[in-house]
Amino acid sequence: MTTITLVQGDITEQRVDAIVNAANSSLLGGGGVDGAIHRRGGPAILNACRDLRASHYGAGLPTGEAVATTAGDLPAEWVIHTVGPVWQGPGSDPTLLASCYRESLRVADEVGARSVAFPAISTGVYRWPVEEAARVAVEAVRAGETGVEEVRFVLFDGGTFAVFEGVVG
């Protein structure tokens, strides 16, 4: 049984086995949580991402998929990079967003991670409404068959934390 915990804070400070990065498909860093993870984790993460691009993901990591790299200088063993979908307005299909969580947990199992910190994937510049994103995230984690013992949602601001708190119950 996976325990879900909520934290308001900085995901780059979480002492967990794996930190999930809401990456862009290039895997080369960007803004928001992606940029923060690359900055705090140091060059080892970028180098590992470049190697992945050269060996497996020449066109970039597809939306909804996940892949692990070293965590570099972060207080974790792994960073699991996943590419969330961009909100296209009402009627947007949440399937790819749910896939980000399922695939990240699958990769966590592959690397032996027992504690995983997730951001609120796609709720920043990708504009997914927090209420729906929280519901999709929590449902995907609860429905997942995984050896991960703790999923920690690390929410940057109080409003997002409150929404996730309402969904988790």
Please give the residue ranges for each predicted region.
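Phosphate/ribose-phosphate-bearing ligand recognition and processing surfaces
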Residues: V86-G169
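Glycine-/small-residue-enriched capping loops at alpha/beta junctions
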Residues: M1-E110
